């Protein structure tokens, strides 16, 4: 009986390990549409995705920093969640205007719509989120359709907006 239980345990462990999701990160992909040097430097994103899953939801994450500082990072709480997470850098004040920050956010979202299926994502499951200044970018992109219209994307095609602590007065 012990041998049967041992064999069964080994079989279950083997099956469980075979199903484990493996995640991969690709860093510093350029999404910039502008060719100026500052855009080429800052308009980069990292994509964290499960290698063996398809039809995954995607969260585009904009960092905080008052639009004047900060850098992209994949939030720990979103890792190993069965989702694709895209962490975005954007140009910062005072080198650019708030409108250019919003334009960068829209360009990153457009990049995601164009590229996410290559990484196992589903265009119908794209969420936009961020903290502080990232929350502001999230809200403004969703509330003012002109930003995504520039890329022929309807803001209503986003699965959801999840801003964390951003002011909404421009």
Where are these regions (language model features)?
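Short beta-to-alpha linker loops that shape the active-site pocket of alpha/beta-hydrolase fold enzymes
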Residues: 65, 89-96, 167
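Primarily recognizes the serine-hydrolase "nucleophile elbow" in alpha/beta-hydrolase
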Residues: 113-170
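Short amphipathic alpha-helix adjacent to the substrate-entry channel of hydrolases
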Residues: 71-88
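Bacterial Sec-dependent N-terminal signal peptides
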Residues: 1-22
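Short beta-strand element of the alpha/beta-hydrolase
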Residues: 55-64
